[in-house]
C-alpha cells in the first residue's frame, strides 16, 4: 500500500465483489492478490471463485488469515475448517498451507504467476522448525527424519506438536517418520507412498475437518495399497462450539502432543 499505492484497493466488507473485481483484473492480464479472513474469502466467495476464476481459467492468489479456529473466541462465523475441502474441489486450483515466513515467501515467489488460482492458507500460529531454502519446493513434501514404525503426515503449525510427540515416542522405543506437507494440492504422493510402504501405518495431523482435507488426500493416495493402516487426527466432522483460546480448543479435540501419542 505504501510502496505501490496505485496497486492497492480496499474494497471493504464486500468480499464477493472483491473476488469478482480481482477476476476482472486477471482477465485484463494482471496478477491479483486477494486478502481477507479465511471464512470470508473462501466460503462466502465460493461461487465467485468457481465462476469468475476457475471456470474462466485465469490465475490469481488468495491469501487468507485466521484459518480453522485461529479466531477462536469469535465463534462459528469466524471459524473455518472446511476451506481446503471447498477450494480443493475446484479445477485449476492449488493449495498451499505454509506455517513459517520462509515457506510463504518462497512458495509465493514460486507460484504467484503460474496461471493457476493459488490459495494460501496462513495460520496465526507457526512452527519453530527451521527449513533451508532448498528444502522448500512447491508440490514437494519434506521428510523431517527417517523412521520405521509409523509415518506421521503433518500440515501447518501442528508440526510443532508432532515433533514434541516424536521425541516422547522415541523414548518409548517407537520410531516415527515425520513428513511435513505445505502443498496440499498437488500433494506429494510419491513421498507418502514410499514412507507408507516402509512403516505400514500412517497418521495424518491437521487443523481442518478430517473430511476433505489432508486426511482425505492421503487416504486417496493410499487406497490401492494393501496392508497400510490410516488414522486421522483433526476436526472430526463437527462444529467447534467450545469457547476458549486457540490452545484450549486444540486441547479439547486432541491436537496436542499427548493426543498424537494416544
Locate the predicted segments by residue.
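Thiamine diphosphate
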Residues: 1-262
Amino acid at each position: 500500500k505504501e510502496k505501490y499505492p496505485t496497486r492497492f484497493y480496499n474494497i471493504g466488507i464486500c468480499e464477493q465483489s472483491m473476488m469478482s473485481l480481482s477476476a476482472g483484473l486477471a482477465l485484463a492480464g494482471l496478477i491479483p492478490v486477494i486478502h481477507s479472513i479465511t471464512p470470508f474469502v473462501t466460503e462466502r466467495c465460493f461461487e465467485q471463485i468457481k465462476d469468475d476464476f476457475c471456470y474462466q481459467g485465469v490465475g490469481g492468489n488468495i491469501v487468507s488469515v485466521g484459518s480453522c479456529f485461529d479466531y477462536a473466541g469469535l465463534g462459528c462465523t469466524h471459524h473455518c475448517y472446511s476451506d481446503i475441502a471447498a477450494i480443493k474441489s475446484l479445477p485449476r486450483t492449488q493449495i498451499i498451507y505454509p506455517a513459517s515466513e520462509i515457506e510463504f515467501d518462497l512458495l509465493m515467489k514460486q507460484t504467484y504467476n503460474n496461471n493457476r488460482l493459488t490459495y494460501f492458507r496462513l495460520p496465526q500460529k507457526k512452527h519453530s522448525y527451521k527449513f533451508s531454502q532448498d528444502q522448500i519446493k512447491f508440490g514437494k513434501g519434506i521428510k523431517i527424519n527417517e523412521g520405521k514404525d509409523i509415518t506421521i503426515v503433518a500440515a501447518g503449525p501442528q508440526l510443532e506438536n508432532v515433533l514434541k510427540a516424536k521425541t516422547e515416542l522415541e523414548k518409548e522405543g517407537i520410531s516415527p517418520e515425520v513428513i511435513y506437507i505445505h502443498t496440499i494440492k498437488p500433494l506429494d504422493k510419491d513421498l507418502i507412498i514410499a514412507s507408507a510402504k516402509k512403516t505400514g501405518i500412517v497418521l495424518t495431523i491437521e487443523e481442518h475437518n478430517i473430511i476433505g482435507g489432508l486426511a482425505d488426500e492421503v487416504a486417496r493416495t493410499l487406497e490401492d495399497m494393501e496392508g497400510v493402516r490410516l488414522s486421522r487426527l483433526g476436526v472430526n466432522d463437527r462444529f467447534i462450539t467450545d469457547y476458549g483460546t486457540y490452545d484450549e480448543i486444540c486441547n479439547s479435540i486432541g491436537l496436542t502432543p499427548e493426543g498424537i501419542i494416544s
